[in-house]
Amino acid sequence: METLNGPAGGGAPDAKLQPPGQHHRHHHLHPVAERRRLHRAPSPARPFLKDLHARPAAPGPAVPSSGRAPAPAAPRSPNLAGKAPPSPGSLAAPGRLSRRSGGVPGAKDKPPPGAGARAAGGAKAALGSRRAARVAPAEPLSRAGKPPGAEPPSAAAKGRKAKRGSRAPPARTVGPPTPAARIPAVTLAVTSVAGSPARCSRISHTDSSSDLSDCPSEPLSDEQRLLPAASSDAESGTGSSDREPPRGAPTPSPAARGAPPGSPEPPALLAAPLAAGACPGGRSIPSGVSGGFAGPGVAEDVRGRSPPERPVPGTPKEPSLGEQSRLVPAAEEEELLREMEELRSENDYLKDELDELRAEMEEMRDSYLEEDVYQLQELRRELDRANKNCRILQYRLRKAEQKSLKVAETGQVDGELIRSLEQDLKVAKDVSVRLHHELKTVEEKRAKAEDENETLRQQMIEVEISKQALQNELERLKESSLKRRSTREMYKEKKTFNQDDSADLRCQLQFAKEEAFLMRKKMAKLGREKDELEQELQKYKSLYGDVDSPLPTGEAGGPPSTREAELKLRLKLVEEEANILGRKIVELEVENRGLKAEMEDMRGQQEREGPGRDHAPSIPTSPFGDSLESSTELRRHLQFVEEEAELLRRSISEIEDHNRQLTHELSKFKFEPPREPGWLGEGASPGAGGGAPLQEELKSARLQISELSGKVLKLQHENHALLSNIQRCDLAAHLGLRAPSPRDSDAESDAGKKESDGEESRLPQPKREGPVGGESDSEEMFEKTSGFGSGKPSEASEPCPTELLKAREDSEYLVTLKHEAQRLERTVERLITDTDSFLHDAGLRGGAPLPGPGLQGEEEQGEGDQQEPQLLGTINAKMKAFKKELQAFLEQVNRIGDGLSPLPHLTESSSFLSTVTSVSRDSPIGNLGKELGPDLQSRLKEQLEWQLGPARGDERESLRLRAARELHRRADGDTGSHGLGGQTCFSLEMEEEHLYALRWKELEMHSLALQNTLHERTWSDEKNLMQQELRSLKQNIFLFYVKLRWLLKHWRQGKQMEEEGEEFTEGEHPETLSRLGELGVQGGHQADGPDHDSDRGCGFPVGEHSPHSRVQIGDHSLRLQTADRGQPHKQVVENQQLFSAFKALLEDFRAELREDERARLRLQQQYASDKAAWDVEWAVLKCRLEQLEEKTENKLGELGSSAESKGALKKEREVHQKLLADSHSLVMDLRWQIHHSEKNWNREKVELLDRLDRDRQEWERQKKEFLWRIEQLQKENSPRRGGSFLCDQKDGNVRPFPHQGSLRMPRPVAMWPCADADSIPFEDRPLSKLKESDRCSASENLYLDALSLDDEPEEPPAHRPEREFRNRLPEEEENHKGNLQRAVSVSSMSEFQRLMDISPFLPEKGLPSTSSKEDVTPPLSPDDLKYIEEFNKSWDYTPNRGHNGGGPDLWADRTEVGRAGHEDSTEPFPDSSWYLTTSVTMTTDTMTSPEHCQKQPLRSHVLTEQSGLRVLHSPPAVRRVDSITAAGGEGPFPTSRARGSPGDTKGGPPEPMLSRWPCTSPRHSRDYVEGARRPLDSPLCTSLGFASPLHSLEMSKNLSDDMKEVAFSVRNAICSGPGELQVKDMACQTNGSRTMGTQTVQTISVGLQTEALRGSGVTSSPHKCLTPKAGGGATPVSSPSRSLRSRQVAPAIEKVQAKFERTCCSPKYGSPKLQRKPLPKADQPNNRTSPGMAQKGYSESAWARSTTTRESPVHTTINDGLSSLFNIIDHSPVVQDPFQKGLRAGSRSRSAEPRPELGPGQETGTNSRGRSPSPIGVGSEMCREEGGEGTPVKQDLSAPPGYTLTENVARILNKKLLEHALKEERRQAAHGPPGLHSDSHSLGDTAEPGPMENQTVLLTAPWGL
């Protein structure tokens, strides 16, 4: 024991010396393992092991050896030898050792030793225990001679307490600790011994020592169990301190080697042995001791350490004897020595075993480690591969970014790249399909493996159970034998044989009970298994019914009905059998229970009889007595019970076998899917057992049927091939050989083409050899198989015959086919009725059946609304024809009694299916088509599926949108629909034979009929229908979104009650507008045919539209059409935007609901607290009441009337309680009433506020109308104004402006105010008045607009069209009008505007547009500027609220932007949108170039408007406003634009821009919570709303730059919310740049301003801009002083824009750069706008941001939206070519136009880009476009330019847009190269100042937005 302990302890000490794990490992490994290791082949795992071993060895020979020896050898061998039974203990000890050693290896080694110990222990259990007692002590003594005394005590205490007697107890006392100590000591000794050998380089010794240590370690486990604490103490040196300390002192040197880690005492023990032997000897001795206790000789021989070992044992023994002599008598010492010898021999044996185990373990560990290493290497390789791939992808990404940038610069689309990308996409799709199939197969394999695992697990469990039963039997036999012996002894002892017998019987009964219990458990388990199997069978059955849909294609080939029937039958039989067996089991259990009860009775009886029988003779003959009889009876019962148990066992095994069979069958069922072509062959295999003859007959019948049907199919295929060829030829003649790819035609998205393709799509579809677009191989295959008419009849026919025959075999297939056809007929009827209703609606709407928010624009835009009813009519007619055909088909099906299906119809339907899949690919439901493809494919392989597929295909075609779920369901349920046929195969065969000829004829007839119908049903009709439905769906979704937003607004209004009333009305506007769009309100729409398309493009037509605006919209819609068809991606983007807006809205809802929940929780808490307080108060009152009652009782008692007083008190208390309850309920009611009255009052207040806003808007609109009319009259009176303005209005509106003008804008000029420009008209009227009074009013108007932004919020929606209309009006008109109109919205502002108009400082807008910058009135007087600045400051922070605008606005922006974009493209420069881009831009434009405004009118009609619209692009809100404003400006407020027309880009566009901004901002003021997005909301509904605010924003272009800046900042402050603040800041910055002072300088200043503004303005609020303005027009906004001022002015805004400011202000992006570049290139603003620059700046910078590949230095540095904008600015200065600017504008316009998806806003952005050569413009446009596309306004704000840029770049690449932009630029250049161009983003303009400002504005706009 000591030895064991010693090794254990030694292990611990070693651990101290070294990591125990290492020691142990070494010990374990060292002995034999070490040798083996030397010869072992190198393995990747080994290096680690070697290192570990080497390290342990390195620490010190003693340590390593000690580690090795102690861990396994010393402890284990003694323990094992000494205590076989303790083997488990030894295991535990090794566990401890391993833990201490940290030994992974140790742990591994230990288990094996443990095992060895068990084996040894098992054999020597008894001996082991006794020896353990004796030997353990002896061993320790002999081995270590160290603390034998101590060890013996522990061992003795355990093993031979009796023998040692007095000695043992002392040993125990000291022992437990001592053994622990000793264990360490021994271990140390062993370790030292091992170590010494190691030192001596005695491998053998080391091995032996390690072996010994191993052996001891196992034994240790036992001792350690007993002495775990002791051993640990010993290790620590505490346990062994008693005796060992002395030794420790002497032995420190020897022990130091092995035991030093251990406690000093172990070293002491070791010291003696070590001292006895040489260093090697000592080592050998310890090893000998540890390993050789049992037989030192053996150990020596084995390990070659015999001499040292023996000396060692001797030495240790003597010391141990000496120790023991102290503790134990000499006699015992001899006995101990003998025991030690025995243990030594045993230890040697065990050591050998341990060596083997250790070697095995090492090998295992090596293998494990090798696996790990290989795995690691594999992972590393994978990592390397992934890194390489990443690098490659990064490289590709960089290349792609460079390409895209190049494309953006050159505007050329790389068709080859697109084609290659398409090819890559196809390949990727095919790969994904293939991978999907592989995944399925892998999944199946995995399921199989899992099932196998489960069965194996069950088998293991069964084996365990049987093993347990056998063990129980063995134990019972043992016990019975023992009992027999004991009974004999009892007889001998004269115990009553009765009792013995009864005891024996009781034991047997107990065993029987246990067995019965086991059986019950087993039976229950079997029952559970049976239930599970039954459930699985049930599941599989249910699955099997639907095999077709759920199963993979391979399994779904079509469930052969015969095989299914057989399997079902067998399943039923099996289930019945299982039920019978289950019942039997239950019966047996009942019987078993009865027997048990009988046994219990018998036992009780016996026990009762027991006392009486005591008298019975005790002779063995007692069996003859009564007791003997009862016992014999019991025995008989027991035998009976055992027999019953045997029967149960047998039945259970039978049931298990049966279950196994079932599970096997089930797994076969599951994992052996029928081979598709091989149904016939397989049919019999699964359930072949009993129905062999039947199956043979079935096979023959199937073969016959397959032959017949094969012939039929071949004929049909040939027939169809001929028909399809003929049709193809016809179609080729018809369509000019466009047949090849219906999908290609789709991509072209020509409505006519689609129709023609629809015809050919069915036939030509098969022609496609390879996947087109997004098709996959499976789809291609599907097409081949699905269309008999496919070019390869052989391909189609080959797979089909057998499958078709199989499918036909089931009459059920026919039934399901009939059901499907009927369902299809019903669907067709529904479709026809729907189309009729559509036609009716279309008639009502005048040709705009589905005016959606630009959703329907795809086809109808080009065709015009009138085409829709016709198209629907043709669709309806064709659907009716199809219905007739379907009815004929149903009749034919009815005639065919059998399962034969009319193949021609199938063919058609299959072709339809392929068409559907192709269509669906193009359509938003493309995924559906792709999913259907494979499903349908698998089904088409069966005839029945062919039949169903076609019908379904038709249905899908017609109902792609409506029936998406049905499609999925059918696709999956095709086979499911085919139930098992009621008819037998024989009847089917008979029917096949009889009806063969009839069918053939009918099929031919049917194929001809189908051929006729093929031409009727064109695929374009289907696509048109789908698109209409899609549009209606989108519209409905959008309406739902708007209503949700309205609801949310109401909700918040109810909650907040402050400015929410205004927000509420604004919220309503979008809804109203959307409703208008939905209804197709066509006041203006009907007026002009072209406008119908434009209306659609706009999304929400407004009642009044100017024809011009319609024209613009029409063009836009055309662009959208081409873009949409060419790029289904646009739809995806729009959908994404819509749904992202939805998501944002839902998030808002969730936030509101959470707030409500929180409020509810607060109320609950309050209620709980109040209630608790009330309870406390009530308790207090109750106590007082009781006290009072007691007092009163006492008094009353004294008085003698206690009873009465009690009654009175009770009554009184009850009354009080009642009163209290009543008062409580009253209080609660009152509280509730107050709460609700407050709510109602809040609601009423909000409603009143809304009403007030609406009334005020109405007043404003009327006022604006009057003003506008007066202005018009004045213009008519004044030849210059009248001619240019009116003409511009009319002509301009018709030309480019029509595009800009939204549908709303089309409303006549007179009606303009009514165009929902509630606030705008109001403001516009003042503006127009101002314009009339003073042409310089444009600048003022900007300023006033900025001031009046508050009023504009609600008007914006209506105003937008007006503004757009105005934009259309000649810029001269706008200049004439002057932006001051807007100022009127604010009464004080209107007064101010009038003053401004009169003021000499303002340049006149009335001046001819041709007037040059010189004409511009001087900037406002410093006083005026200060006043404006003050005013702006007052307003500055209000707008912050407005910025919370959400997704809805983005959505609206998208639609509107798309429309605006179209309009913009029509106009060379959408000035208004440009201004919209940033209020600053507007202000700057207006202020910068009154002359620009004047000049701009010339090209403003086209260019200015477009610029404005494009400007819209940068911010979605701005976009909307812009599109509306541009269009509106052109129309009703062309005057405003005219005012700005000199700088129409600046002035006119500024108006629209400002209008939008104001719209945004006023709303923002109200909707600050909702933010700028809300302004977008109104744009959502229509651009009308924004138009008016924008117009209002238009300030007189004559305002001085400073004034404009101030006005703009004011407007921004008013209009923009937090988000808008940024815009304002940016606008301010832009304005600042424009405000630069001199118009000419403006351009240069623009750069500086942009920088300073960016640095300051961007970061700071509009106040900053105002501050620079206050500084004076002379100071460029970009000037540092201004920027500083601006920062000081608006800290709050600075915070908002801080992020932008940082980048912008940083030297990288820093205003310094901008200042430098813009200033030096002040003359090059146009150049900046050069296409390269613009694209670079706007597309690259924004793009670079998005891609993180920043080619341009500026872009690279710039990380946020502002920086990108700045980069754009930097770039724009670089290019000076007006032409380049034009290119850039073109590219922008392209981006906008390709963006048609985005909407007019996008185009506007594009135009504005064209207008403003500055990259900033581009950036803003990009932002707008991006926002329009689907990026939220936030995106626009942050990095919209970049992100949008990437997408926009592609669209910008549109050549048409480029050309258009170039044209516009040329026009611009021609019209106003001077200031005008700069204002109108003079792409063509050489006037740098304007362009610079515009660029700056653009930059600012994206930021602000």
From Swiss-Prot:
Spans annotated as Necessary for colocalization and binding with microtubules: 1-249, 1678-1773
Main location: membrane
Segments of this protein annotated with the region Necessary for interaction with MARK2 and apicobasal microtubule bundle formation in polarized epithelial cells: 1265-1382
The entry's keywords: Cell cycle, Cell division, Cell membrane, Coiled coil, Cytoplasm, Cytoskeleton, Membrane, Mitosis, Phosphoprotein
Positions with biased composition (Polar residues): 1744-1756
Gene Ontology BP terms: cell division; chromosome segregation; establishment or maintenance of epithelial cell apical/basal polarity; microtubule bundle formation; positive regulation of protein targeting to membrane; regulation of autophagy
Compartments it resides in: Lateral cell membrane; Apical cell membrane; Cytoplasm, Cytoskeleton, Spindle pole; Midbody
Entry superkingdom: Eukaryota
Assembly notes: Homodimer. Associates (via N- and C-terminus domains) with microtubule filaments.
PANTHER family (UniProt xref): GIRDIN (PTHR15742), MICROTUBULE CROSS-LINKING FACTOR 1 (PTHR15742:SF3)
Protein name, as recorded: Microtubule cross-linking factor 1
Taxonomic classification: Eukaryota, Metazoa, Chordata, Craniata, Vertebrata
